[in-house]
Each structure stands twice: as structure tokens, then as C-alpha cells.
């Protein structure tokens, strides 16, 4: 194992940037991530590593993840020696999932939740806040992420834009907030954000997410999914919200 670690570290060291993002589609035991973290220690770099693998014979959960968790936290090796952890690193674990093809509230909500995780990875921003400018965030309407260095606002309901723009207008910010809007159209919404154009950076949804969202978004002419068909659309409140009757005070808090 040591020889493979050294080889991968040498290969990674050939890259010019100490802020590279390394993608390994054949993660195996996680040697690439281990080597990345070790190389960062050696040269003060800030490389990031994404591992992708299946979980055949539980290798991802029991080997790949466990190995790198221990590398970060510290561990005792086979000789009984204490190995100091590479504690300036962190590790996140995601599982893929399937979203049904049928147009329904359930599939739409599942997609936006999963897609938001992907946006967090894209922006390298994971710290979710439960308020935005004094307004509580609400599940299914908008979510807000802020790690003290950058901010991201993800809007699921177009009807919320005007109120959120009013909130942004009154904010004193040092850099633009990245804004994503889930919408059946590719409208970037510049017009709606004109008054706060200096405070936001409107971001297009990745094309794959946008295409999937359009495919499963219930059409307005479709009958509202009934509770027995959709476990997440169980109340009149849900159906009212879906039909455009936005009400911040009634929607379930995130």
C-alpha cells in the first residue's frame, strides 16, 4: 500500500495548482484521497478530492470511508503505533438515489433536495442557515447557505422571488450572493433581480438538473396528486402552495 500511496502522491504533485480538484472514478480503498490529504500537508496545498465508487461487498462504507475517516481522526497502526490525524481535512459521504420519471410533487421535491446537495458540492458551500435576513427559511420554498466567506440562496418557488429581493435589498453585504432558481424555464430572472443586481450573482442550474426538473415538474393542467398517490402531498396546504398560493407563515420550516 505504501508504494501505491507514494506513486499517487508523485502523480498528483505533477499538477501545477495546489488548489486542484482531483476526481477518481475508481476509488477502491480510497488511496487517492489519502494521498491528496498527505500532499496538502507536505506543501501547504488546498487540493480537494472526489471519490466515486459502487458499494460492492460494502467496500465503500467499510473500507473507503472508514480508511479516510481514520486518516483524518488519527488511528493506531498494525504495529501499535499512534498515527496523528490529518485534522485540517473533512470528509463528506453521499449516496446516489433514483428519482421517479412520473410528474408528481413527490418526485419534484425529491429532485430539488438531491440537486441542492449537488449545488453545495459545486459551490463548495455546505453550511446551511435557518434564517435569511431575519426571515426563516422554509422547506420547499428556499434554502440559504453561508460559511462566513460566501453565500448561496437556492429558490424553489418563483412566487418567493419578490419577497426575497426585498430582503436582499436591505442587506449590507461585501460580496454578491450566488442565487439559483428552480424554474421550468431557462429564464435567468435578471429582470426580477434588477434592484439588487450588485448584490447577487444569478447562476444557471446545471443543464442536467434543469432538464430533469422540467421532465418531472407537474404540469399546471395535470390534476393535483392526491395523498394516496404522493406521500409528500398530504394536505390542502401542500396543494395550495403548489397552485401558487405562497404563504411563508404556513409552510413547514426547514
Q: Language-model segments: which ranges?
A:
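Accessory, often C-terminal, charged low-complexity segments
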Residues: 1, 5-21, 41-254
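A phosphate-binding catalytic loop at a beta-strand-loop-alpha-helix junction
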Residues: 20-39
Amino acid at each position: 500500500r505504501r508504494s501505491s500511496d507514494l506513486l499517487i502522491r508523485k502523480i498528483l504533485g505533477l499538477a501545477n495548482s495546489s488548489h486542484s480538484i482531483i476526481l477518481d472514478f475508481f476509488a477502491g480503498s480510497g488511496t487517492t484521497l489519502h494521498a491528496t490529504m498527505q500532499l496538502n500537508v507536505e506543501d501547504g496545498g488546498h487540493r480537494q478530492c472526489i471519490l466515486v465508487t459502487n458499494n460492492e461487498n460494502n467496500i465503500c462504507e467499510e473500507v473507503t470511508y472508514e480508511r479516510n475517516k481514520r486518516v483524518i481522526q488519527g488511528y493506531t497502526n498494525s504495529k501499535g503505533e499512534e498515527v496523528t490525524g490529518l485534522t485540517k481535512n473533512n470528509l463528506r459521504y453521499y449516496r446516489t438515489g433514483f428519482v421517479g420519471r412520473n410528474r408528481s410533487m413527490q418526485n419534484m421535491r425529491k429532485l430539488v433536495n438531491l440537486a441542492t446537495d449537488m449545488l453545495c458540492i459545486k459551490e463548495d458551500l455546505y453550511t446551511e442557515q435557518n434564517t435569511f435576513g431575519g426571515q426563516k427559511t422554509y422547506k420547499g420554498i428556499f434554502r440559504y447557505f453561508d460559511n462566513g466567506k460566501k453565500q448561496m440562496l437556492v429558490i424553489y418557488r418563483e412566487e418567493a422571488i419578490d419577497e426575497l429581493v426585498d430582503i436582499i435589498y436591505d442587506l449590507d453585504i461585501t460580496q454578491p450572493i450566488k442565487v439559483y432558481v428552480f424554474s421550468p424555464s431557462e429564464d435567468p430572472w435578471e429582470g426580477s433581480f434588477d434592484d439588487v443586481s450588485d448584490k447577487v450573482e444569478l447562476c444557471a442550474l446545471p443543464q442536467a438538473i434543469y432538464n430533469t426538473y422540467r421532465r418531472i415538474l407537474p404540469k399546471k393542467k395535470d390534476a393535483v396528486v392526491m395523498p394516496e398517490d404522493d406521500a409528500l402531498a398530504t394536505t390542502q396546504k401542500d396543494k395550495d402552495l403548489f397552485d401558487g398560493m405562497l404563504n411563508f407563515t404556513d409552510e413547514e420550516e426547514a
